[in-house]
Amino acid sequence: MLLDTLQTQFRHYFPTQRNFVLGLSGGIDSIVLLHLLAELQLNLRAVHIHHGLSPNADNWAAFCEQVCKRLKIPFILQKVTVDRSEGIEAGARAARYQAIGEIIQPNEVLVTAHHLDDQTETFLLALKRGSGIKGLSAMQAVGFWQNFTIFRPLLNVSKAQIEQYALQQQFTWIEDESNHDSHYDRNFLRNEVLPIVNQRWQHFSQMVARSAQHCAEQQMLLEELLAQELQRYADFSEKRLNIEAFPQFSLAKQQQLIRLWLEKCGAQMPSTAQLMQIIQQTIYADVDKNPQLKLADFWLRRYQHHLYLTGELLEPDDFCQPLFAQQSLTLPDGIGELQHLGDSIIYQKSGKIDRLLLPKALVNAPLQVKLTHQGKVKQYGKPMREEMKKRYQQAQVPVWLRKRTPLIFFHDQLVFICH
């Protein structure tokens, strides 16, 4: 019985968790799951995402609200705008999860009605894209999306079982007309390919799920084996990866370490072609080169023996402000905050705090803060002037951060580079 299956899944994965949000489309899968969850006496809310892609979208939202009202389950409606640049399916999925991320609470888990047949489709779509073992792992019963957890308790339940239960219970649900459009890849598999395959091999979906699980286990093992080395080379707080030793690694190891680092930094996974471009243009670049590559919403940049993952960095306007003892100064464009404590300077940025002790002669002295300096500069306490570029290099400030790094001056002498 489906209810028994569901209870077993909850006891196994979330024995103490009580707060859940159901992604409710109004289709047969999520309607069945809604009724099942209502019997478990959980702290449950349901969210319906209004994509605005169908003329029936308003009716679907109203239907979901009525069902939830009847079951006394709090209902949330979220309207989204779908970015179609990456395709309607991908755009709708991204908009859906972003909207859910806006309403889900830290103590809640998202529950979705993905089932065994969905798993087969996901696996075959990954196969079509040429995915490796991570992609071929398809979906897991418990997954993550940015800041929340996703639970798929019906992943081992077939569509036929769900349909049978819905008919037995005389549920009503909505039919999305786009599900019959085989122009979409997933629908093509569902409507044209899998019915023929299942006629030939009755347990095809179960075997695909088994293969996906094998891939997931291999991926977990790979991550476990590389965990220590990743920890050695990666600084996740700074989104930085030391690649000095990478040329002596095999290509496969280079690829996996870069993939794992990018994933843990929250970046979109590169394609195989992009990954090869990253390796060729960064790992094997001359040490004096500073290549940079666009990766979705991020930039991948190399400086000396490190890779850095950054967002789009805007160049701030010219900045020059005095900093007196016992005074604070907020820098523009999120660059941070400075405090002059008399005997030291505190530089605070993104939760990280550095304390720079002033020379005795400069205790309580008025200072000056700049974000850039051209030409030569005299370091405080040293007789010779030298190029500012050399001072940046000595302080290991990457090229793209040099106009976003505070410089502390006493008159025309450089006291600190705050990096």
Curated annotation (Swiss-Prot):
Gene3D superfamilies attached to this UniProt entry: 1.20.59.20, HUPs (3.40.50.620)
E.C. designation(s): 6.3.4.19
Domain of life: Bacteria
Chief location bin: cytoplasm
One biological process term in Gene Ontology: tRNA modification
Keyword Ligase recorded: yes
Record's subcellular location: Cytoplasm
Class of this enzyme: ligase
Positions of transmembrane segments: none
Keyword ATP-binding: yes
Coiled-coil regions, chain positions: none
Catalyzed reaction equations: cytidine(34) in tRNA(Ile2) + L-lysine + ATP = lysidine(34) in tRNA(Ile2) + AMP + diphosphate + H(+)
Functional summary from the UniProt entry: Ligates lysine onto the cytidine present at position 34 of the AUA codon-specific tRNA(Ile) that contains the anticodon CAU, in an ATP-dependent manner. Cytidine is converted to lysidine, thus changing the amino acid specificity of the tRNA from methionine to isoleucine.
Domain notes: The N-terminal region contains the highly conserved SGGXDS motif, predicted to be a P-loop motif involved in ATP binding.
Family: Belongs to the tRNA(Ile)-lysidine synthase family.
Protein name: tRNA(Ile)-lysidine synthase
Gene that this sequence comes from: tilS
